[in-house]
Curated annotation (Swiss-Prot):
Lineage: Eukaryota, Metazoa, Chordata, Craniata, Vertebrata
InterPro entries: Gly/Sar_N_MeTrfase (IPR014369), Methyltransf_25 (IPR041698), SAM-dependent_MTases_sf (IPR029063)
Any one GO BP annotation for this protein: regulation of gluconeogenesis
GO CC list: cytosol
SUBUNIT field: Homotetramer.
Name by which UniProt lists this protein: Glycine N-methyltransferase
Family designation: Belongs to the class I-like SAM-binding methyltransferase superfamily. Glycine N-methyltransferase family.
Modification type N-acetylvaline: residues: V2
Residues binding S-adenosyl-L-methionine, per UniProt: 22, 31, 34, 41, 65, 86-88, 117-118, 139-142, 178, 223
Organism (species): Homo sapiens
Function: Catalyzes the methylation of glycine by using S-adenosylmethionine (AdoMet) to form N-methylglycine (sarcosine) with the concomitant production of S-adenosylhomocysteine (AdoHcy), a reaction regulated by the binding of 5-methyltetrahydrofolate. Plays an important role in the regulation of methyl group metabolism by regulating the ratio between S-adenosyl-L-methionine and S-adenosyl-L-homocysteine.
Annotated positions of the Phosphotyrosine modification: Y34
Enzyme Commission code(s) on record: 2.1.1.20
Amino-acid positions noted as binding (6S)-5-methyl-5,6,7,8-tetrahydrofolate 2 in the UniProt annotation, renumbered to this chain: Y6, H217, R242
């Protein structure tokens, strides 16, 4: 493991198998504060996602990287039937707590939350009688958490195949990643606001790129976040944590996605929620892939 020479995550965070980078609990707690609740989601993101799902008549949604549940909560509140899964039990506890606190609301009482692993997703999430979900979402740069341990991206292919298998015929997969093309060419993230959440706690984010055998192997982001009441006297304190990501470039990730559907899909790419054209002047922070199963 590269952890022996390069620390890829905060101390106490798991490094075996599909890594739970929030396993120490502290990173999960700080991340929950960092991204906030549904009110912290940007209006542009909320309008775009809800509009996309309703445009395609989606009702049953699988969130395969729900984390603390912020997107799933938004969808439940908007009337969607939601199944939420994540590999981190430390993150899921926030979603489970919200469901418990709102259990008297029929929509939240029906909200399904499970711990699941992308590598065994076809076993962890039973197929519905309808043959899959209307939409599967994997947003917030979540898929990039999965490393390439074997060096051949076989884990990525298996995970994407399992995720794609959850989509019914005619259904959607909505998945994103940061603009790693820009990060790898410049060494830093594109300038601009975060398109997903309005956090006022960030003090600094440092980007590092790990090169192995002349190939980009990992990107790490070191977050410095101001946490209310974390100081000894109750004043705001600073918390630091590191997360690592596999740097998926646009062209190669597009090939992986289309292979996951066996080529039987319609595929469009957006840059920060707007149609993306290679060579355009505006440099997006995120690439968002929307795939519609056609078989």
């Amino acid at each position: 493991m590269v952890d022996s020479v390069y620390r890829t995550r905060s101390l106490g965070v798991a490094a075996e198998g599909l890594p739970d980078q929030y396993a120490d609990g502290e990173a999960a707690r700080v991340w929950q504060l960092y991204i906030g609740d549904t009110r912290s989601r940007t209006a542009e993101y909320k309008a775009w996602l809800l509009g996309l799902l309703r445009q395609h008549g989606c009702q049953r949604v699988l969130d395969v990287a729900c984390g603390t549940g912020v997107d799933s909560i938004m969808l439940v509140e908007e009337g969607f039937s939601v199944t939420s899964v994540d590999a981190s039990d430390k993150m899921l506890k926030y979603a489970l707590k919200e469901r418990w606190n709102r259990r008297h609301e029929p929509a939240f009482d029906k909200w399904v939350i499970e711990e699941a692993n992308w590598m065994t997703l076809d076993k962890d999430v039973p197929q519905s009688a309808e043959g899959g979900f209307d939409a599967v979402i994997c947003l917030g740069n979540s898929f990039a958490h999965l490393p390439d341990c074997k060096g051949d991206q076989s884990e990525h292919r298996l995970a994407l195949k399992n995720i794609a298998s959850m989509v019914r015929a005619g259904g959607l997969l909505v998945i994103d990643h940061r603009n790693y093309d820009h990060i790898l060419s410049t060494g830093c993230a594109p300038p601009g606001k975060n398109i997903y959440y309005k956090s006022d706690l960030t003090k600094d984010v440092t980007t590092s790129v790990l090169i192995v055998n002349n190939k980009a192997h990992m990107v790490t982001l070191d977050y410095t976040v101001q946490v209310p009441g974390a100081g000894q006297d109750g004043s705001p304190g600073l918390s630091k944590f590191r997360l690592s990501y596999y740097p998926h470039c646009l062209a190669s990730f597009t090939e992986l996605l289309q292979a996951a559907f066996g080529g039987k899909c319609q595929h469009s790419v957006l840059g920060d929620f707007k149609p993306y054209k290679p060579g355009q002047t505006y440099i997006p922070c995120y690439f968002i892939h929307v795939l519609k199963r056609t078989d």
